Amino acid sequence: MSKYEFIKIEKKWQEFWDNNKTYKVEEDPSIPKEKRLYILDMFPYPSANGLHVGHPEGYTATDIFGRYKLLNGFHVLHPIGFDSFGLPAENYAIQTGTHPQKSTEENINKFKKQIKALGFAYDWDREIRTHEENYYKWTQWIFLQLYKKGLAYVKEMPVWYCPELGTVLANEEIIQTSDGPKSERGSYSVEKKYLRQWVLKITKYAERLLDDLEELEWPESVKEMQRNWIGKSTGVEIEFEIEGHSDKIKVFTTRPDTIFGITYLVIAPENKLIEKITKNNFKQNVLKYVKHEELKSDLNRTSLEKDKSGVFTGSYAFHPITNEKIPIWVGSYVLGTYGTGAVMGVPAHDERDFQFAKKYQLKILPVISKSGKNEILEKAFVDDGISINSPNEFNNLKNSEVKDKVIKWLTKNKKGKEKVAYKLRDWIFSRQRYWGEPIPILFDKLGNAIPLEENDLPLKLPEIANYKPSGTGESPLSRIKDWVNVKDMGFTRETNTMPQWAGSCWYYLRYLDPKNSKEFANKKKIEYWMPVDLYIGGAEHTVLHLLYSRFWHKVLYDLGYVNTKEPFKKLINQGIITSFSYQKENGVLIPNDQVIEKDNKFFDKKDNKEVTQVIAKMSKSLKNVINPDDIIKEFGADSMRIYEMFMGPLTDSKPWNTKGIIGVFRFLNKIWNLREKELSKENPPREIISELHKVIKKVTEDTEKLNFNTAISAMMIFINELLKYEKNYLNIFKPFIIILSPYAPHLAEELWEYIGELPSLFKNSKWPKFDESLIIKGKKEIVLQINGKIKDKILLNKETGEKELKEIAMENSKIKSNLLNKKIVKIIVIKNKLVNIVIK
């Protein structure tokens, strides 16, 4: 029996595909739009750690689907590239002392080698790298279009600054932990700083970003996360006059029906009015409080679970309708970046206001109740009801009626107006780091921004020896005086760089025309391929990359450069592949190499105490990362591909277990060993034809729906049936090789060649069609024997009884001819299997 030499086979076919550019694709106008398919993976950033077995899960899914569609006559574009600018690459460079240019190139080469070893059908001629000049030239060009459209502006603002990373971070890059706000990357401490920043006006597109979600075939959970992040509210903006000041406080509320329950106003610690309106004898306490609260995260300040804090300014505002005096407070739970940065305190009808009023013993005045009467409140009443304690014309009405009347009154008396507000904030676009796209802006002596001319692009990132963060909030580029100062013009350059998200905002468009030096992509090529039909990647990018790229795409659509309103038609989030780790009694996880197994139990080597095996995310510190190189070396790429898809539904999280891949490896060996049987061109038995069409149907339907695990299961069942036959029927084996090929392309190519077909299978075959009429439903093959020797095989319903089986057998022509002049001793019936007639 010849051995399944997967290493040799996989190397052979990977070289064949590379040398013959099997997966290269070019635009063919004769192919109709409905037969074109653009499939995309969220491209990787090339970390020094390389891939672990979780990374290829999404790549394998797109590869299977792309190959399946290719065999079904689709013109498939499936490109790959590297998100190579940004913090991960730069942090690694700082840790190792290797320049990010060098380390990034080395890491990309490592990634490419690992990706190619898995046999993905990428068109490598379209490879892109976001740190290369021919790419970031167009990132800079798109930034200039945003600037010219009034969507990029400079602003001095409070921002999250991470001393460890040495840069400003966007709100979306901050996470809340029990130890306070941290950077999403690295979980480092952050602080608030006032810095000059470039900001992109994503808020101008808030409504469209919200509305157009309805057109997308995305997971509902992702759409809901974007809706919540955008956070649309419809309400009214009310103006409050301040006693002794000409300034006014504007408040946005969705509950104007509660206006008569206002007992105080709260303004955000960031509000510029604070210093102006705070009374002198209150100023010291107020400014101390403001400084303290500015360091807290937005989530920490607004959470219902967190204690509400505030301080009185000593000043008062006037109620816009009753003219009553209302105390003005500064409070942590009001954000300067949301709405107007001020709220009206209605403690009877808002939970946060209720907590605040209770803490500071402020008046609580109910103006809506269920019964229409005063009731004792133990918590805020937030439901609909009847108005109470209100001026006559607003009293004793449904609160919905009060809402309409209040809006009309405020509008008529010019004290307020209807308005839509969003939680979404403009995107902080500056980073005080070296390894990123230089921002193509100059400043004159007055500080006015001047965009570079387009023919001066790319503005190249200068090579520097010291690329470490300055620690002062300035970019390392600010230290290169010859570069910063444009002497012949008297201008200075912008020294901040763009965030990592800039390059990934539009990379799917560059794949369409990666070598174009005159435009970011030819419009005809954009119209040929866009939108992306299937996009697979992690859910962690929901309010970062996915939102940002939708924003940039809409800007390019408005400018006439792209032909679709949305970039990604269908989105799938693959589940996380986890790994086993080990937990001590106190809940602490310990590294895997610190654990020993004895009698199916696990123990800590250090203290010999038993530990519990648990499922955890793969991490270097826990030493539970599984390297795909090791798996491929032991079992082969095809085994790894199939195992990752066989573990469970694509969108579910599942733990990696190397023992589980052994079963998949055996499955591929069974297929390989079919070569040992005679390859017969005879007509196959009726039942195996039925099984073939059954498996074609199942694999077709499941692959179309991305239900890869059940498709693989069906193929395993089929192979077990096929192994029962003495011969390997060509008419069965050939179509099976084709349906196997998206899942195990190397083995399929080898078997395709073995049966005498020309490679590549993916260029010289078509996906087989199943014939429903050939699928036997509810029937079994019954063997007819005389003295234990097979004379015929017939198909009968499973329910056929013993008496009827005997009658059918006796009427069979082949049996009849062998019974002439013979004495029947007995008839043996085994239900659903055989009828054996014993004669003498």
From Swiss-Prot:
Any Gene Ontology biological process: leucyl-tRNA aminoacylation
A GO cellular component annotation in the UniProt record: cytosol
Motif segment ('KMSKS' region): 617-621
Protein known as: Leucine--tRNA ligase
Catalysis: reaction(s): tRNA(Leu) + L-leucine + ATP = L-leucyl-tRNA(Leu) + AMP + diphosphate
Binding site for ATP: 620
Main location as per UniProt: cytoplasm
Segments carrying motif 'HIGH' region: 44-55
Uppermost EC category: ligase
Keyword annotations of the record: Aminoacyl-tRNA synthetase, ATP-binding, Cytoplasm, Ligase, Nucleotide-binding, Protein biosynthesis
CDD domains in the cross-refs: Anticodon_Ia_Leu_BEm, LeuRS_core
Annotated HAMAP family: Leu_tRNA_synth_B
MF terms in GO: aminoacyl-tRNA deacylase activity; ATP binding; leucine-tRNA ligase activity
UniProt-annotated location(s): Cytoplasm
Record-stated family: Belongs to the class-I aminoacyl-tRNA synthetase family.
Pfam families xrefs: Anticodon_1, tRNA-synt_1, tRNA-synt_1_2, tRNA-synt_1g
EC number: 6.1.1.4
